[in-house]
Amino acid sequence: MLKKSLVIIISALIISSFAACTGNAGQSSSSSSSASSVTSGSSVSADSSSSGNSSSSGSEEVTFSGYEKGIIDTTNLFTKRDLTQTADTSSAKTLEVSDGQTLKITEEGVYVIKGTAKNCTIRVEADDTAKVQLVLDGVSITNDSTPAIYVVSADKCFVTTGADSTLSVTGAFTADGDTNTDAVIFSKDDLVLNGTAALTINSAQGNGVTGKDDVKVTGGTYNITSALDSIEANDSIAIYDGTFTINSSKDGLHSENSDDDTKGYVYIHGGTFTINAKSDAVQATTYLQVDGGTFKLTAAEGFEATSIQINDGTIEISASDDGINGTQKSNSVGTPSIEINGGKLTIVMGQGDTDAIDCNGNITVNGGTIDITAQMSSFDYDGTATYNGGTIIINGEEVNSIPQPQMMGGGMGGQAPNAQNGNGFGGNGFAR
């Protein structure tokens, strides 16, 4: 009886093992077949049953909160997946770009993009709940008039640079129907740029990156040369980290929403920024909040927004108009303001009618170090100036109050009553 029982048990185990091996072999064959069918054409319509999904490459759980007294609510700004610099490619599909072709991605998933091509567009046209992650693995795309990456629809698209890649558009952009696709990377929905390698973007006649929703950058290295704005967004630009070398014939970072005055803000948590811009290095129509980072900005104006708050960071600005400018760019924000709570600011102004820190409203200094070199105006404001702490140095001399604004006028042979006499001090109200 015992022998018979043992025989039955052993037989069952053998049958079970054989079935498992057969099943695994079938799965392997199916996966291989799916991958080859995806890479063999110019148009990709991904099969969601075999592609990666949002949970495979980092949770969308919110883990970030910025400066608690900030002018921007940063509570839900970055998710864990936004901040994850490498993609989970265990279930990813590998696609290769080719000349004159469009890679069309229609399903949520992780896609590793390889190869070199001319006039090739990676087109994401997925469901509005889909999260699509493009992993650039040594990609080089050069187009005449169309975006290299075009996100038509998705809940969110991640562009993750896994190996050094280059995207270029050499001519004027051609519209896609009613959509003015004016950037090398153009997205109608939320866009996240991250990664561990360098992405070079060249735009001969347009923007480098355009997002019609939110644009977030959480890591990676970005070398952007553009005829217009280097990074532009309708709703917001939020930067957690990254290294940026930007040469722009317009603005370096630009956020503006003409339909909703509560949007159009820029938030910077950290990163390293070298920006050369003919207009503004960083412009927001509503709020600009800087919580950290290292900045070397050369532009007509360094920072411009309706309300500006600087809480930390090492900031060097060389400007030909205003170093930091708080001006009424949005009626919803209220009175323009500049608030400096920390950080180290070095502002060097060019010759002419220039202001190092200029606000059409109120200036408040609570902390930090402000070192200004200005032949004309160090501070200019239409409202009030409040000095509660920190260090202010003007042309090498430390002062213990914010100078009064310069009064223009005085005629051909005279000088304005409160003119700064070339020393950067604002009239009679400064204290040394």
Whereabouts are the PLM-identified features?
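A composition-driven surface/loop motif
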Residues: 2-432
